[in-house]
Regions:
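Aromatic-rich membrane-interfacial microdomains
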Residues: 1-52, 56
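A solvent-exposed beta-alpha-beta segment
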Residues: 36-150, 218-225, 232-235, 239-244, ...
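Flexible, Lys/Arg-rich cytosolic regulatory linkers and terminal tails that connect or flank
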Residues: 93, 98-99, 125-187, 193, ...
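NAD(P)-cofactor binding segment of oxidoreductase domains
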Residues: 126-140, 212-219, 262, 282-309
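Conserved Rossmann-fold NAD(P)-dependent oxidoreductase catalytic core, especially the SDR/UDP-sugar
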Residues: 150, 270, 274-334, 338
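Strand-loop microenvironment adjacent to phosphate/nucleotide-handling motifs in alpha/beta enzyme folds
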Residues: 173, 178-182, 338-539
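N-terminal Rossmann NAD(P)H-binding glycine-rich loop of SDR-like oxidoreductase domains
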Residues: 188-204
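Conserved Rossmann-fold cofactor-binding substructure of NAD(P)-dependent oxidoreductases
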Residues: 247-266
Length: 539
């Protein structure tokens, strides 16, 4: 019996061994793979940048799903201002109060905070961004809802905080009736079409469906660039607007007249100008010839060609100018005011003043971004300098709307919001790049801010208005200013003398004439023209 039992058991054991071996093999292989995967996953996770997602709404959840598809970021938590979802778990990620961000940074070594709040107001974004400045983390954001391609969020759509976010200014929707009044079904001409403002005017004008859009530009490359861009836009949108690229100088009245008459121009936006204060200060005669007499040539050509509306793009630097550029733009305004007051004037002249536009050539923002990327220092001319800022699209839209409101000789002033202290802007840009300001209190910081001294003709503060007679219009961001003016009979004498002084390179007479005209010119520096200085060295 014992032998029989043993025999049966051994037979069963022999039959079970393959099964046992198979199970051991499966468990061994599976567990080894799981261990290896865990090791590799942990290794990959350590290589990824730990991030916090600010905003646990639909956009934040989409961003989390997008992050999981790439090996760049490792999301460790949501934070959200909504107390109803704090202390909950969404997609295996806990939602924290924003006050707990310091703890999360310390515990998980968070290096970046990703903003996923596209529907927030500009004021709300500004408040959140200012709170995040306290942490040494780079802040990135997804675009606003209107800028998202197909409404989809991806890691590639993340971008750095822009100065627009720092300004926290809510846009005012453009009024269609004002946008189209001088453009729709009309022939429109933009001088300086390849510049920062000129090119944006062209983009906005194209959307308002003129019959023709004339791009008038001195720079061949700038003209080529904007013409190419607009044609690509037209192809994508199926637009039938005729775009006409024209090379020419605004100082050539014959060229201007022939263009305006040949195309029967209805509306002119005059954006061509020399605008950089030091450059005009160093090249006084060219600045006056272009800004004053170039404007006059355009305006007179418009009158001769029967143009209905002429809008001058002016500047806040024309108010109590301390430099030649500002004085030259104020002289340009005086020219239009005088022409507008002429008897039986059929062309409606107006001018629109505003401050600095974000992203324009020479703007502090791209300069600061480049300096931060290069490790500093950020160079600033004065620690107390302030400026007004506006986005280029908003400025262009307001210029078009203001032009439609003009009755003749109007000086419009755009509401630029609050002035910005440039040193504060520089500090914010450094901190939001995940770096620290290097100064006496923080000698081991990353980026130093270096004060270089005011440039020739540069103001500490800019003004937008002259006098107190400021009147509101029907648009909340457009006002009118009451200005001193001269009738054409008096102004033409000054202009004649000014032209003679330019032709004779008489810098002293130029300055005296700018002082004699009602420009409010109070020069901050002596004569800075480089050729004049070189000649005086030789003497």
């Amino acid at each position: 019996m014992f032998c029989l039992t043993t025999l049966v058991f051994e037979q069963k054991l022999h039959l079970a061994l393959p099964i046992v071996y198979f199970l051991v093999l499966v468990v061994g292989v599976t567990s080894s793979r799981m261990i290896l995967r865990a090791i590799l996953t942990d290794h990959h996770r350590k290589q990824m940048t730990p991030v916090i997602i600010y905003g646990a709404g639909q956009s934040g959840r989409q961003l989390l799903e997008a992050i999981k598809q790439v090996n760049e970021y490792s999301a460790i938590a949501f934070v959200d201002d909504n107390p109803k979802i704090q202390r909950t778990v969404i997609y295996d990620l806990a939602v924290y109060n924003p006050n707990e961000i310091p703890m999360l940074i310390s515990r998980y070594g968070v290096r970046k905070i990703l903003l996923a709040i596209p529907s927030s107001t500009p004021e709300e974004r500004k408040d959140i961004i200012r709170r995040l400045e306290a942490y040494k983390c780079e802040v990135l954001t997804i675009p606003g809802m209107k800028d998202l391609v197909d409404g989809k969020i991806s890691v590639s759509s993340l971008k750095k905080i822009s100065v627009v976010d720092l300004l926290g200014r809510a846009p005012v929707a453009p009024r269609p009736e004002l946008m189209s009044a001088d453009i729709s079904d009309k022939v429109v001409m933009v001088t300086g079409a390849g510049g920062s403002i000129g090119s944006e005017l062209c983009r906005q004008i194209l959307n308002c469906r003129p019959t023709k859009l004339l791009l008038f530009e001195l720079s061949e490359f700038a003209l080529y660039s904007i013409d190419k861009e607009l044609r690509e836009t037209q192809a994508a949108q199926g637009s039938q607007v005729e775009v006409v690229p024209l090379l020419g100088s605004v100082q050539n009245k014959e060229r201007l007249s022939s263009v305006m008459k040949a195309y029967h121009v209805d509306t002119v936006y005059h954006a061509a100008a020399y605008k950089h204060v030091p450059m005009v200060e160093f090249n006084t005669i060219e600045g006056i010839q272009n800004n004053v007499f170039g404007t006059l040539c355009c305006a007179q050509a418009a009158v001769d060609a029967g143009v209905s509306t002429f809008v001058l793009i002016s500047t806040d630097k024309a108010v109590r100018p301390t430099n030649t550029m500002g004085a030259s733009k104020r002289m340009a305004e005086l020219c239009l005011q005088a022409l507008a007051a002429e008897p039986e004037q059929k062309t409606r002249f107006c001018m629109v003043r505003f401050g600095n536009v974000l992203g324009s050539s020479g703007s502090v923002v791209p300069v600061f971004e480049k300096q931060i990327a290069e490790g500093g220092p950020i160079t600033l001319t004065h620690q107390d300098i302030t400026r007004y800022f506006m986005t280029i699209p908003e400025a262009a839209q307001l210029v078009i709307q203001a032009g439609a409101m003009g009755k003749g000789g109007d000086v419009f002033v755009l509401d630029m919001g609050e002035s910005v202290k440039i040193i504060d802007l520089a500090r914010q840009m450094i901190v939001l790049s995940g770096l620290k300001v290097k100064d006496e209190q923080h000698p081991h910081g990353d980026i130093e801010i270096k004060i270089t001294g005011l440039r020739p003709g540069e103001k500490l503060y800019e003004e937008l208005l002259i006098g107190d007679e400021v009147q509101k219009t029907t648009h909340p961001r457009i006002m009118t200013a009451s200005e001193v003016m001269l009738p054409w009979t008096q102004l033409s004498d000054i202009l004649s003398e000014l032209q003679t002084a330019c032709l004779q390179s008489d810098q002293n007479s130029l300055r005296q004439l700018l002082l004699r005209a009602p420009t409010g010119f109070v020069p901050k520096d002596g004569i800075c023209d480089l050729v004049w200085q070189q000649n005086n060295k030789a003497v």
